[in-house]
């Protein structure tokens, strides 16, 4: 029986998690198949990850977008989220979601009733928690990609295979090993010969000259 998600993710133990997800339909992120090229779908995931890391208190330390699945190593930054003001939380949540009018009134100082103020403050904390939630992060990633692919395929139904898998990274050795494992995925799968030629991976992005001055600990941060 699969472990409940709250048993797989325990931020009190570690902030690093290796996430993997596989598609149901064989055509997902493949290159050429049946006369169609789906390579651009891998770019969808990379661009969505960039957007989500600008919104969530979650960094991407390593990633590899494969033909029919992907690997992402994330770091949850609870301290960063704890320091956000109410205005920052509303702005970040509003990147993808509608913020209720009463919260906008709270931010403007227009709420008078204590119950309304308390409700607004409670909602702030709910949003703060969601912005550190791996489940919400993955939901915002995977539902978006599924909608795009289903529209392109002119079909409906499940796009992803069950739940995403999450592996807690508990020490520095495991962190390094996981990053190496993710970085070398395309080479093991024989779809690339070298790290720098591994398309849609964090290792190729780090090696690229334009990224030599970037923070090598996080692909997106």
Question: In which residue ranges do the predicted regions lie?
Answer:
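Short catalytic/metal-binding and nucleic-acid-binding patches
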Residues: 1-221
